[in-house]
Amino acid sequence: MSLTNLFKLQSSLKPSGDQPQAIQKLVNNFKQGLKEQILLGATGTGKTFTIANIIQHLQQKTLVIAHNKTLAGQLYNELKAMFPNNRVEYFISYYDYYQPEAYVASSDTYIEKDSKINDEIDQLRHSAAGSLINRDDVIVVASVSCIYGVGDLKDYQKSTLHLQIGDKYERKNLINKLIELKYQRNEINFQRGTFRVRGDIIEIIASSSKEIGIRIIFFGNEIENIQNFYVLNGKAIANLKLITLFPASLYATNNQKLQESIKRIRQELKEQINHFEKTNQLLAAQKIKMRTLHDLEMLEQIGNCNGVENYSRHLALKGKGEAPSTLIDFFGNDFLTIVDESHVTIPQIKGMYFGDFSRKNNLVNFGFRLPSALDNRPLKFNEFQEKMNKVIYLSATPGDYELTKKIPIVEQIIRPTFVLDPEIEVRPTNNQMDDLYFEIKHQTKNNQRILITTLTINMSEDLTTYLKNLGIKVAYLHSEIKSLQRLEILKDLRLGKYDCLVGVNLLREGLDLPEVALVAILDADKQGFLRNERSLIQTIGRAARNITGKAIMYADCISPAMQIAIEETYRRRKIQKQYNETMKVTPTALNKTILETISIKQKERIKNEKGKSKVQKKLQINTNMTAKNKEIKRLQKTMKEAAKALDFEKAATLRDLILDLEKKEKR
């Protein structure tokens, strides 16, 4: 692959509307040495397509950061379709559930870390890391998970195993090497991150794969053949000349470095015990001694321990306060960063370090963790800035941080479809439910979709139930729905399985839904984050891809935020209308392909669903509707809210109650 033509954008579309001038300005500014720019693009103007063209022009590895998993998934699908011959990867948090380790001093309560890892997302994370090391034509779409510590890049590279036919390699040495790379030998449960031995054959399932394995065939002490094969049936796919095998863990390290790390941990333990004894904190001294010695024993025996990430500073042989290794380090020095919906993403990146520090500092002060655990953290904002090279802040409503930087702002107002911004109506709250129902029925007759945004979760739930009882095909999109499932719901809305989506804070930035013709904003005049001018402009923009797009604000007065949002929307409408009249063009409907979602297991789920009998399906529905399951869901919601509010004691109590209920359900 030519280094000057790594990225090849494949699309039947050509830049149009404001896209050509935006692409040219952004590319020229970078070529002139500018490092940061803002792309102020109205909703539906094709900002992702503009970014894809910039990637093709610059020919550089690209990191796209989104502020939530739903938007990250959508961007991943779109960019993967535009760059089918390049590596487009997905890197988000792999936790389905995460209760962090914490200590509540007021009640002397220690809460152990509890988590559930999504194996599918972990696989995608490994794939992203491997691609960045192995290739130059890589785009990674990530959440803010990319600023959290992962294993050291140099260790990961050194641990990479290269094998080719004809290599002299004793079978037992390869087995030992695989164990060093954190692969587990498992002859029975052969799955991702394991290997098995059958005579002169070693079979491996890499950390970045699940369905395709690697087969190493020996003849004596020589590698005679290498194959990849289907894990399901063992059938060979192709013979390979060589393979590159990445570690099964992002925290891989060699034995020599591990021994040095253990020495450093012992030294820090000694210093911390002395500190506690001098300050007469004898209980804390005893706790840290017992915990750390147990962890050291595990590290010496198997090279791993529970909470190994808390020793990441020592494992990477870094100094106190030094920035942790993150996915960003895997990009090298010269790469492009796209901060999507920057008005939300930048504040999110800024706040990550402080929340992490306040929780861990308690653990250190009371003898549950060594001070070095504080360096197992997300990047501080200044560290994030230092790692950036070329940056585009992407938003329809740039935030204060971007606007105060005095960097070029490139506007993209005209849509390729020449569709105008939505019309806005302000209606009184009196009889708003009846009015909303009438609007929904009117839109569904024309095969259009509707988004409704409320202020509270309870209001969303009640409204969803109310509309369901009226026969509306409606779904409730909320934060507790798993990231991949959210993408399925959005796809189902476009396909017509649902006519209407109700939500609180997930129906704003970036959702690309051309079928949505109506956005209803309840309590639009209420002051606060969910109804400030940026939030209102973003929410109105959800209907901006539809020719008949309209936004209805239900309010009893026009708030200052509403006034700004209405004025900005009509400023853009005026520019768009003048352009259409001057160029003699007519708005056209956007027929956008409905892309497959990320889920690797999707086909398997469909197959299993088809195999169920009607009786089984009915039984499953009845079971899901039991009062006990409803209570479990309610408790899970409360538990997550408590964890977000840093009320870890309450969260732990709720977790234990949920586990108890689930055990009773199984009986």
UniProtKB/Swiss-Prot annotation:
Disulfide bonds listed in the record: none
Keyword Secreted belongs to the record: no
UniProt-annotated binding residues for ATP: 41-48
Subcellular location: Cytoplasm
One GO CC term, this protein: cytoplasm
Assigned keywords, A-Z: ATP-binding, Cytoplasm, DNA damage, DNA excision, DNA repair, Excision nuclease, Helicase, Hydrolase, Nucleotide-binding, SOS response
CDD domains: DEXHc_UvrB, SF2_C_UvrB
Family to which the UniProt record says this protein belongs: Belongs to the UvrB family.
PANTHER family xref list: UVRABC SYSTEM PROTEIN B
Quaternary structure and interacting proteins, as annotated: Forms a heterotetramer with UvrA during the search for lesions. Interacts with UvrC in an incision complex.
SMART domains on file: DEXDc (SM00487), HELICc (SM00490)
Motif Beta-hairpin location, chain numbering: 94-117
Database matches in InterPro entries: Helicase/UvrB_N, Helicase_ATP-bd, Helicase_C-like, P-loop_NTPase, UVR_dom, UVR_dom_sf, UvrB, UvrB_inter
Function recorded in the entry: The UvrABC repair system catalyzes the recognition and processing of DNA lesions. A damage recognition complex composed of 2 UvrA and 2 UvrB subunits scans DNA for abnormalities. Upon binding of the UvrA(2)B(2) complex to a putative damaged site, the DNA wraps around one UvrB monomer. DNA wrap is dependent on ATP binding by UvrB and probably causes local melting of the DNA helix, facilitating insertion of UvrB beta-hairpin between the DNA strands. Then UvrB probes one DNA strand for the presence of a lesion.
Protein's GO biological process: nucleotide-excision repair; SOS response
Name this protein carries in UniProt: UvrABC system protein B
